[in-house]
Amino acid sequence: MTCADVTDLCTQASQLVQQLRTKDGELGFMSAAVYDTAWVSMVQKTTPEGRQWLLPKCFEYILRTQLEDGSWETYASDVDGILNTAASLLALETHAESRIASTDPPVEEMKERIGRARAALSRQLQAWSVKDTVHVGFEIILPALLRLLREKGHEFEFDGRAELDRLNRIKLSKFRPEYLYSARTTALHSLEAFVGMIDFDKVAHQKVNGSFMFSPSSTAAFLMFSSSWDDECEQYLRLVLQNGAGGGTGGMPSAYPSKYFEVSWVRGQLARLESKLTELQALTTLLDNGYSTGDLGIEDTDSLGEMLRDALVKGGGIVGFAPSIQADADDTAKSLIAVSLLDKPVSAQGLIDAFEGPMHFRTYHGERDPSFTANSNVLLALLNTPDAATVSPQIEKAAAFLCDVWWTADSEIGDKWNLSPYYPSMLMAEAFGKLLQVWSDGGLKSISSQFIRDRVSVCLYQALVRTLQTQNENGSWGSHSHEETAYAILTIAHACQLPVVNQLWTNVQLAVSRGRKFLQNSAGDKAEYLWVEKVTYSSILLSKSYVLAALKVSFERSYPACLANLFIVSKKRVIEFARFHSMLPLFSSMELWKVRAAIVEGYLLLPQLRDRRLAVFSRTGMEEDKYFEYIPFTWTLCNNRRNTFLSTKTLVEMMVISFLNYQADEFMEAVVGRLNSSQRSMTRSCIDEIFRDLKDKPELNDAIQAQSGPRNADANGHRILPQAKRIKMGSQLPSDVSRVLSAFVHHVMDHPSVKAAAPLEYERVKNELQVFLLSHIEQADDNGRFAAQLESTRDDFETARSSFYRWVSSTSSDHTSCPYSFAFYQCLLGFEQASHNAACFQTCEEKYVAEAMCRHLAVMCRMYNDYGSLARDRDEKNLNCVNFPEFAQAGPKSDAVRQKQLFSLAEFERSNMKRGLEVLTEMAAQDRAKMRMLEKVQMFCDVTDVYGQIYALEILRVGCDLAHDCFMLELPAQWSNST
């Protein structure tokens, strides 16, 4: 792997650490923010000479940075530009009303600037998607700005206004001014959001070192709206102007630190203290990724370590981001990690006592939503304690929380404090990599190997593969960002603790080499706006620390036997399965290493499927289920092919429903299909009775709750099915038929996602599932009549109940399980968005087109199936599509002609399926949530298509070994341009 000169890297790292030490600790590395600068520019002070602007350079900065279209810079998110422009428009109006400085622009210029700013803000608000905004506190800050602008004569109406007002009401519903007066809360960081709501004089005592939570905008608001002047606040703002990132040019950061704040994370939002720019983070990043204290300068690291250790001891084992500020788990965890790496460990008991919750660690008291990144840091801190075994329960709790969040995440983990999806992945990979090390060394015997194998390792492997697959052509990641590229390289490095990485080692080396080459060959001094404060900000210091870490981190691999033995993944088997799947049109253009990576992921998930393999259907008397092994591959391949990255929870549930469908098909053919006509009729009545017993959805929910009591799970965390009702159908029907069918139906209908679905969605699953089972009996009846024909007449079906079109569009396609599985899949997708009355498609048009699209998909799959299974069907006397009278004109000895016609019809159905997807895309009208939903629907179509392509190669039913026997099979010539 390409690596920079080690000596040069150590020199750069040492210089970076030296920047953390100044004579008085007053140094800030956070980029200047127009929003805070605008607030400071509005502060007036009464002097003997009259009223004056306190810091006129700040208003000069606002004037200098207004863009041609009237707005101010949007750093990374739409809300950045909105807040910057709104605050600056307010500053323009304030200066226009108070002509107290000769340096302010002429009246006409001010009017022109105000007009352009107003128009720009109106455009920004109209184009803004409120529901897609992640910045914490915007729902309080922006309404306050709009309220102040309304007082200046500016009224703004926009599509997202109702949603913004709704969020504002929710946020303020429990707010009481007394909270700010009596306790030091994070809301003090944004006092400007409470103009007109609080008495500013009553928060004066909350000031620390001349500021309110180290926020220039909050401190400016206090000076503007309190009844008396505060010299300490003035001194603080002047200090920020001179020493902050603006360097005296007028720009003010969103937060400015002091004292050991410089070696702790800069935090502060309306909702919580959260770490952003942090010299502590820079220090721990370097120490944890290949740099020693000697590399960084013993004197510097010792003094920083002592400072942090003293703070922890004085705080009872916990710290906040600055003296006298509320302690939080994130800063505490980072501090514990740092002192441990500096060989000055402090007990983690204070962290546990203060922040441990029932299911995860709280970042601070009163936190509403748990933080993924905070729990990652907590886990890493606990793992770095001298005796990790003593905190094993807490380690498992934090790790389980991270796994649960990753398991249910849609595509990627979002973080409130960093816009890059690679940042949470990096922290999780670092924590899980350390967990594997400590567990392998025998330090965590209470944590089961199953948890390590089935949860931790799957999450870590997915983080690795998804990082590898999203690398840009020039070797970078994200928006061609140095900092994001460093995150990605560090993710890969820590994921190398997994033994299965050996399967991809060449690709890992190549990706890291390309990434490091990008970091070395391109300038990295440009600000990269990734960190979230009131607006997004950048930090050259943090960026450099991550880049230096990525250039030096080790990729050495050593796998103790206890860890390596958890993963039985044959490299030969992976290569053979990858070769086979690469033959299929859907994956023929997919890079071979990506195919292998998906196969390995499938193998990692396979043990969980085996645990549930006998949940419904017994294998007694059945042939070997060779299909079982490759079911996870079809899903992981399609999931990774387009980087869809469906949630792992949904992915696994669809794998389970896939093998249950095969088992149901086997049961209906091997057991029900061999019954006589009278018994099949009784089975039909049995199925009808099972579904009648389900009743309507509301009653069903009550009945299930009464029957099963609390939501039960077995030792593996899987649902325990309620005891299936035994249907009394007489002695002629084998007893296991009603029991097994009832268990299968209840497994599907009792699924939490189905139970939580909207009534229409629930009924659709119910109806499609019933049709699926009944279609097997209809198919068996058709097969029976077909088999009764003389062998000499068996090329054509003489007793067809309908046209070929009607049959293949109903009985035959229902028999594939595609329609009912799609209905079930929609419930899973809907449940990802809402826990009650969830629906994947909302409007009548969407539902209709989606169902029509699925029907074409099912028909296409059935035709592919019959295309490949003609010889088998003939041997087993089963009805095939080409036996319908419509194909008779081809003649009796015309298999090739009939198959060609059938394939042509399958391609017709494919075109209709594609058109359905196109119409759904048009209906989505660029709605982000709907477009994301359609990506998942496309993936379902891909999975179904894969099965059809496998069927067409006559593999699934012939019983050959997919990993070995299929490589001599040839693709249909017609397939060259079909996918």
Swiss-Prot record:
Binding site residues for Mg(2+) 1: 665, 669
Q: Which InterPro entries does the entry link to?
A: Ent-kaurene_synthase_fun, Terpene_synthase-like, Terpenoid_cyclase/PrenylTrfase
Record pathway: Secondary metabolite biosynthesis; terpenoid biosynthesis
Per the annotation, the residue ranges of the short sequence motif DXDD B-type cyclization motif are: 328-331
Give the enzyme's EC designation: 4.2.3.30, 5.5.1.13
Alphabetically, which GO biological process terms does the record hold? diterpenoid biosynthetic process
Q: Where does Mg(2+) 3 bind?
A: 865-866, 869, 873
What are the boundaries of the signal sequence?
none
UniProt cofactor(s) = Mg(2+)
Show the Gene3D superfamilies listed in the entry.
1.50.10.160, 1.50.10.20
Locate the motif DEXXE A-type cyclization motif. Answer: 665-669
Task: Identify its protein family.
Answer: Belongs to the terpene synthase family.
**Family annotation (PANTHER family):** (E,E)-GERANYLLINALOOL SYNTHASE (PTHR31739:SF25), ENT-COPALYL DIPHOSPHATE SYNTHASE, CHLOROPLASTIC (PTHR31739)
Entry comment, domain topic:
The VYDTAW motif is widely conserved among diterpene cyclases in plants and fungi. The DXDD B-type cyclization motif at positions 328-331 is responsible for the formation of ent-CDP.
Name listed for the protein in its UniProt record: Pimaradiene synthase pbcA
Phylogenetic lineage: Eukaryota, Fungi, Dikarya, Ascomycota, Pezizomycotina
Gene (name only): pbcA
